[in-house]
Amino acid sequence: MEQRRRGGAVADPRVRGLGAAVSRLRRELAVHPAELSDRAVAEDELAVLAAMARSGDLEQPRLHRSLLLVAGALGSVSALGPALRDVRDAVDLCGRHTGPQQGG
């Protein structure tokens, strides 16, 4: 899914959507006042997702692993629910094949 324009900008709107969703969740997590035991795990995995979105190089297993770790760390925090849902939806969109299915 590595689609790039000149200047390094990612051309695929799904990848841009992932980057925007991850940025929103990172911002909301940064200002969330509660002490979260797995905050560092969530922050690390959000950084991984952000890096993949910036590069446009999306590894499906890694995307899903990071999403699971973030959801496990933050899933019980209702204030972050909408932003987390946006990240999940963006990961799902990035995982959808637009071309012919492989291996089947």
Where are the regions a protein language model picked out?
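Mature extracytoplasmic or organellar-lumen-exposed domains after removal of signal/transit peptides
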Residues: 77-80, 84-90
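Short amphipathic alpha-helical segments that predominantly mediate membrane engagement
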Residues: 1-75, 92-104
